[in-house]
Amino acid sequence: MDNAQIPLEDTWLDVVKKAVRGLHFPEGELESRSGLSAGTLGKILSGQLREEDLRSLAPTLGLNPTRLNDLAMGRYHPGMIRLPEGIAMFTTPWHDFEVHSYLVWDPNRSGRRKEAVAFDTGSDASEMLSFLVSHHLNLEYVFLTHGHGDHVFDLDRIIEKTKASALQGDREETPGVQLFTPGKTFRIGSLEIETRSTWGHAKGGVTYLIKGLEKPVAIVGDAIFAGSMGGGIVSYAACLETNREEILSLPPETLICPGHGPLTTVALENLHNPFF
């Protein structure tokens, strides 16, 4: 699918609710800090949109008011972004949304069969498995961004069909998966895969930074999305901190490949993401 046609993972209301949940305001605190009445806050949290109310609320939630309103008014989408040669994205349904998984290989590697690595599995690995066969790719590893069900659902089938090894960060606990400490670097052909801890949404979330393709590529799972980020299920503060330090500090041209929603770049998220 054309990246410009992939809808954003989160609406403005999703962003606001993630911030409210993450900050755990005591009763009445949000009203007193924002200067908004309980009635007005109730309207906002039920999806009633007024730009001036969002501008009043955003700073209290640590959100950028202009970026939040741009999201609410439909003024932000990453638009047309293409994947570089050597990476493929697969999109599969999961309940009422979709989840992405990825294959990466060295496009400059010679030989009939090239090594490849997968990142997550999605809900159905059939298309990925067919792609491996049609493109003469030999799957060596399946790297997991985190262990949530929509990202690992078809892991057993991929391992059975390809005999690949599955790996994840050492704070996750997916049965049968080898563990590594983030900071470790892997190689496939001439490509380098650097692992970075981006926990907060999951306790062992990992971002994989791939160097050696046409541009740097960060496969981030649910750490960050175009215009949003994964909810702080484990730690909201850690989500914000690790996204800033491990993803948004990367070169501006770095392609961000998320688990949901459209592709984006470090430059675009530094300009448009309301959380940062």
Each PLM stretch: what is its role?
Residues 103, 185-213, 249:
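Core dinuclear metal-dependent hydrolase active-site scaffold
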Residues 79-134, 208-221, 227:
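Conserved beta-strand hairpin/beta-sheet module of binuclear metal-dependent hydrolase folds
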Residues 1-23:
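A short, Lys/Arg-rich alpha-helix, primarily the initiator
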Residues 113-116, 124-192:
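Active-site HxH/HxHxD metal-binding segment of metal-dependent hydrolases
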Residues 35-49:
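Recognition helix of helix-turn-helix/homeodomain-like DNA-binding domains
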Residues 2, 113, 203-276:
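Metallo-beta-lactamase
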Residues 52-67:
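DNA major-groove recognition helix of helix-turn-helix/homeodomain DNA-binding modules
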Residues 26-31, 57:
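Short alpha-helical "recognition helix" segments of helix-turn-helix
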